[in-house]
Design a protein with these regions (language model features):
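Short amphipathic alpha-helical interface segments
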Residues: 1-50, 54, 69
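Generic surface-pattern signal
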Residues: 16-20, 34, 61, 87-94
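Generic detector of bulky aromatic hydrophobic side chains
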Residues: 24-35, 47-48, 52, 65-67, ...
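Alpha-helical DNA-recognition elements
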Residues: 58
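A short, conserved structural fragment
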Residues: 61-71
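Short, amphipathic alpha-helical interaction segments positioned at domain boundaries
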Residues: 74-129
């Protein structure tokens, strides 16, 4: 599994039907690597982390994801917000605690999915997780 990276098709598949908290996105990446939910895979952790950070940046740049904490949107550029995640991200599957880290105070933000023009009046719909 060394140097495995998501293919464009896997990225497209993951990005197609996103919703739910960020641990879902982490789980989709884990699944793409063929790793079972309770399996620890230190060899691929850094690559999965890079893929996760890449995907949240991509989704933010596309306007499909905003990050928020305590009911307030995070401020700063996409790069600054991704860097905030990079700095606080766990160093291993063990520290990730089966995806529970995304619900701990140490996690800098949660997902707010943006559905463009989905409200009755044509405004964007925000799904807070």
């Amino acid at each position: 599994m060394d140097n495995f990276m998501l293919t464009q098709q896997q990225i497209d598949d993951i990005c197609e039907d996103l919703d739910g908290p960020l641990n879902f996105l982490w789980g989709y990446i884990r699944d793409a690597y063929g790793i079972h939910p309770h399996q620890l895979d230190p060899a691929s952790f850094e690559e999965r982390k890079k893929d996760f950070l890449f995907l949240i940046g991509k989704l933010m740049d596309e306007g499909r994801l905003k990050l928020a904490k305590n009911d307030e949107f995070m401020t700063g550029s996409t790069e600054e917000q991704v860097e905030m995640f990079r700095k606080s991200f766990p160093a291993s599957d063990e520290e990730m605690e089966l995806g529970c880290w995304f619900f701990f105070d140490e996690c800098p933000a949660g997902a707010v999915w943006v559905f463009k023009g989905e409200r009755e009046n044509g405004e964007d719909y925000y799904e807070w997780t």
